[in-house]
């Protein structure tokens, strides 16, 4: 995992006004932030980091202070945001934290900016497996796209082609200091259960399981894009500015 790898991925994405790295202070986002800082001269837009205090852990202020210290050391501006709401009694804490995080960051980012997150290949494999267990269709099984529209700009995941081991090797090679969220050690959460209990068993039998599962997600993403393009073409052929034919729509395959 080197600058050339990251620059190659970024070159395939829209050109933003700024790059914002979602920096939790964990190992994945720290590795991404550090890698970007090492090759910032070859990056086409200014670089910032953003840290969200969800207010869910007693040590959250310590994490924010650590994030600030790391960014100061790297010479990167850090934007710190605070979640003020609390999850409802029957609400998933994971979903609450994710929704609040993206809402706050989306509101804070300027137009045409790109949020970069640290999800990697193993995260993609876990996402596909979760979607399978939920009975998802093509949209869900395509899992996490490399880039999508977000707020007034984009959200991209430039580490999706790299394994968890590659990210960890980078962090150890560069002697990065990160914070382990204690909630990641609990298999009470579905994703953690897959990560801690299921994936190790799969990798014991099939060492490249995460890579091949993530590849399936990528292929499903291509299929989703093709279906979307075909559906758009069919809609344009059947709708004009004033009306559309119900009969022509009834001729479409039910999958469309």
Task: Set out the residue ranges of the language-model regions.
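Core alpha/beta nucleotide-donor-binding catalytic domains of modification enzymes
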Residues: 1-196, 200
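ATP/NTP-dependent adenylation/nucleotidyl-transfer catalytic domains that generate, transfer
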Residues: 189-256
């Amino acid at each position: 995992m080197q600058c050339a790898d990251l620059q190659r991925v970024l070159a395939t994405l829209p050109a933003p006004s700024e790059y914002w790295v979602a920096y939790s202070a964990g190992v994945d986002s720290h590795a991404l932030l550090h890698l970007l800082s090492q090759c910032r001269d070859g990056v086409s837009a200014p670089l910032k980091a953003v840290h969200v205090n969800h207010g869910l852990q007693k040590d959250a202020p310590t994490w924010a202070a650590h994030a600030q210290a790391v960014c100061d050391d790297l010479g990167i501006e850090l934007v710190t945001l605070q979640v003020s709401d609390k999850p409802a009694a029957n609400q998933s804490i994971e979903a609450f934290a994710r929704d609040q995080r993206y809402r706050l960051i989306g509101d804070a980012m300027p137009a045409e900016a790109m949020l970069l997150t640290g999800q990697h290949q193993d995260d993609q494999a876990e996402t596909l497996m979760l979607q399978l267990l939920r009975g998802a269709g093509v949209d869900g099984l395509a899992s996490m796209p490399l880039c999508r529209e977000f707020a007034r700009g984009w959200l991209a995941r430039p580490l999706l082609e790299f394994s968890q081991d590659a990210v960890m090797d980078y962090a150890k090679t560069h002697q990065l200091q990160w914070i382990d969220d204690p909630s990641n050690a609990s298999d009470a959460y579905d994703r953690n259960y897959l990560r801690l209990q299921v994936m190790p068993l799969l990798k014991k039998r099939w060492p490249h399981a995460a890579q091949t599962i993530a590849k399936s997600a990528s292929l499903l993403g291509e299929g989703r894009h093709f279906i979307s393009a075909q559906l758009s073409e069919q809609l344009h052929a059947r709708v004009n500015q004033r009306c559309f034919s119900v009969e022509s729509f009834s001729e479409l395959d039910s999958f469309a």
